[in-house]
Structures are given as structure tokens and as C-alpha cells.
Design a protein with these regions (language model features):
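Conserved catalytic alpha/beta core of Sir2/sirtuin-type deacylases, generalized to analogous enzyme cores
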Residues: 1-281
Length: 281
């Protein structure tokens, strides 16, 4: 089914729990770059294009060994950018819908920007399958642990592509620390913090009787979110709403496809879902 906003309203109204699944397209509406779109990485970081460095080459543990200054600048710059960006209105719309349900919500996201938590979502109900820049871990994963990055306030030199502030260190072994994000060819990623939330998500799904999955901005380049959304909706025999301006196709007729940007779709659905509130505003 395609572009039927009324059907989206029906699915959300009858649900007793909302599973929000989100890819990079959810963050794009806040003004953040999408590295997986065509030319997206080099458009955001033209200096890497000049040196013919791809996203896959800088987003790897090897970068911390062979190009340490550049790796710390890249992730420090991204952390500063994410912290300085305000999550768009769509996050609050989703939060209002989800908090009204008897079983509430859970978030499954490949985004590492921490914007669901920044928008007020409960961290214990946000499973960040690729980790988050808001946590750090040992470069060598000495204990298999991660910790909050709140005390790490990177100061970046965008001309010389380096940090001017101190690099983070591991509190356990004293070695260097890195962002707690799953990178390419990453065998040292400390997954424990997210693993706990994965278990909570699986337990929550067993409790929900009438699930609706709302997928936002999840592309095909790395289809982790899309596959999880489809698999879960099928297993729970629940409703499924895929929101994507380009890759909105769905595998089943009763699944809903909305060829729209995340924020536009959420606002349009909310207008129909809460007409009295819109009138007051």
C-alpha cells in the first residue's frame, strides 16, 4: 500500500506499542549529513575527497593506528556537530504518540548521534545497533566496556584537521580511547552496553500484542534497519509504515509505503491523528 496517510493513522491508533526504527534519513531533517547517499560523505567532508579517503577508510580501527590525528579529528568534529544540532520536531511527535500507548515504545536505530536521547527518549529504550558517539571505549577493548563521553569535550582544528584538546584515555589501562561505534572491519567494538538494551527490546516485543513498526529514513546501502523492521513486523503480524523519500518500497501489500521525508510524513500523520490539537495551535 502506498502513500495512504489515513491507513497510517489507523495503524498507530490501534497499536498498544510502537517500535521506532530509524536510519540516517531521520537525522538528515535536523540538518545532519547522510554519508551513505551518493557523494554524501565527500560533500560533507571535501578535504577527504582531496586526499581520496573514503568513509570506509576513515571509519575503521586501523585509522587510529595509521592516521591517528585525522581519526580523532573526524570523530571529534562529528561529536561537536551532533551536540550542536537540535533534533527536529518529528522526534517529539513520535514521543507523544509512543508515550500514549500502554506498552510505550522502543527505538532501534543505526544512527550514532544520540538524538533520540537528546529529544527526551529513555536511553534504556533506545537500542543503537551501531553504537553511539556519546560513549567511549578503549582502543584495544581491554575490558570489553564502554563509558559515557559526557566529559569528553573535543576542541577541533578544522584547518589542520586535528584535535587541540587532549585525546580521551581508557580509565582501566591508561591507553587511548575511541568512540564506542561499530566501524568497518571492527573486531574491537565493545558491544556490552548495547547488548543489554537488545535483550530489553526482545523482552518488550514479547509483551506487545498490537505492534506498529514506524521506519524512518532507512536506506539500502547498509540495510540493517530495513531488515530488522520487516522481520519484526512479519513475526509480530503487526502494522508496518516505511517512510523514505527514495527507497520506500515494501515487500507485502498490507505494509504501508510513504514516499516522504521523515519530518514531513510525521507532521502530516499527526495532523490527521490529532486534529483537535492542530486546531488549538
Amino acid at each position: 500500500m502506498k502513500n495512504d496517510l489515513n491507513y497510517a493513522v489507523e495503524l498507530i491508533r490501534k497499536a498498544d506499542g510502537i517500535l521506532i526504527t530509524a536510519g540516517a534519513g531521520m537525522s538528515v531533517d535536523s540538518g545532519l549529513p547522510d554519508f551513505r547517499s551518493v557523494g554524501g560523505f565527500w560533500n560533507a567532508y571535501p578535504m577527504f575527497k582531496e586526499h581520496n579517503i573514503s568513509f570506509e577508510e576513515i571509519a575503521t580501527p586501523l585509522a587510529y593506528k595509521h592516521n591517528q590525528e585525522l581519526a580523532y579529528w573526524f570523530y571529534g568534529h562529528r561529536l561537536v556537530q551532533y551536540r550542536n544540532t537540535i533534533p527536529h520536531e518529528g522526534y517529539q511527535i513520535l514521543k507523544c504518540w509512543a508515550e500514549a500507548k500502554s506498552h510505550g515504545y522502543f527505538v532501534f536505530t543505526s544512527n550514532v548521534d544520540g538524538h533520540f536521547q537528546k529529544a527526551g527518549f529513555d536511553d534504556s529504550h533506545v537500542y543503537e545497533v551501531h553504537g553511539t558517539l556519546e560513549r567511549l571505549q578503549c582502543v584495544n577493548n581491554c575490558r570489553g566496556l564502554s563509558w559515557s563521553a559526557s566529559s569528553f569535550q573535543p576542541v577541533v582544528d578544522n584547518e589542520n584537521l586535528c584535535l587541540t584538546s587532549e585525546k580521551p584515555h581508557c580509565p582501566y589501562c591508561g591507553g587511548f580511547a575511541r568512540q564506542n561505534v561499530l566501524m568497518f572491519n571492527d573486531w574491537s567494538y565493545a558491544s556490552q552496553y548495547q547488548d543489554f538494551k537488545k535483550v530489553r527490546l526482545e523482552s518488550w516485543l514479547k509483551e506487545v500484542q498490537n505492534l506498529v513498526v514506524i521506519e524512518l529514513g532507512a536506506g539500502k546501502a547498509i540495510p540493517t534497519v530495513r531488515r530488522f523492521s520487516e522481520r519484526t513486523a512479519k513475526a509480530k503480524k503487526g502494522g508496518f509504515i516505511r517512510i523514505n523519500p527514495q527507497d520506500a518500497g515494501v515487500p507485502k501489500m498490507h505494509f504501508l509505503s510513504l514516499e516522504m521525508k521523515a519530518l514531513d510524513a510525521l507532521k502530516a500523520i499527526d495532523t490527521l491523528l490529532n486534529p483537535s490539537q492542530q486546531a488549538v495551535e
